[in-house]
Amino acid sequence: MRLFINTTDFNTSTMKSTLILSACLLATTAGFSQDDNLPKPELTEVWEPVPSIVTPASKPGDPPADAIVLFNGKNLDEWMSPKEPTGPAKWTLADGIITVKKGTGPIRTKRSFMDYQFHLEYRIPSNITGSGQARGNSGIFFAATGQGDSGYELQVLDGYNNKTYVNGQVGSIYKQHIPLANASRKPGEWQTYDVVWTAPRFKDDGSLESPARITVLHNGVLVQNNVAIKGETTYRGEPSYKKHGPGPILLQDHGDPSEPISYRNIWIREIK
């Protein structure tokens, strides 16, 4: 019995296999060649400066190890009343919280700050009355620039089923930026503000070099996203800047007839 081999088919099959293998080798070699032409990965590794170690709080919202505690529930040593700068802060301290004392004016920090991370908790009283801007109104003024309600205001107000103009509701940069959301809790519940503040910069001649910027989380919800502030808060007219340096933080005694609001757990981390 004679065995016949189709040499044409054999040679064609062998040639195809050889071509496929060669193509794979070329592709692999080309890949290695391309990698050889790239910069070494070490050239884009940064090793210094090493970030400082900050021990976080054991409970969310409490101050981390490097924070300056502005109110610890025990005293008002970090605060003063602008109306009487040499005396103690006039608000009421009881049961680990401070409550606005109507008619005494605002309180502000004794220290001044530039750029920082800031945390504060507040409570609208459960028996709150009034409506609109006359319902649990207060405010946080960053870089307070005078004795009264001056600086850049983040609004504090009852925002739970309380209608008012939207650039004046809770979470707004008052009369400048509408909040991205209304994250208000019911009156009687504690609420939080977490803020990243970048102070404005000024040229030697007093003109603005870069505006203040602010990011705000209200009860953990982003309501202001690195917005540029147009100038100091004003009730009437357009905001504007005047040159200043580091400034204190001021809590407002608004003066409306509704029941006073309370604050606790206030701290700050300077950003340098």
Protein language model annotation of sequence segments:
Residues 1-34:
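Bacterial Sec-dependent N-terminal signal peptides
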Residues 32-272:
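Carbohydrate-interacting regions of secretory-pathway proteins
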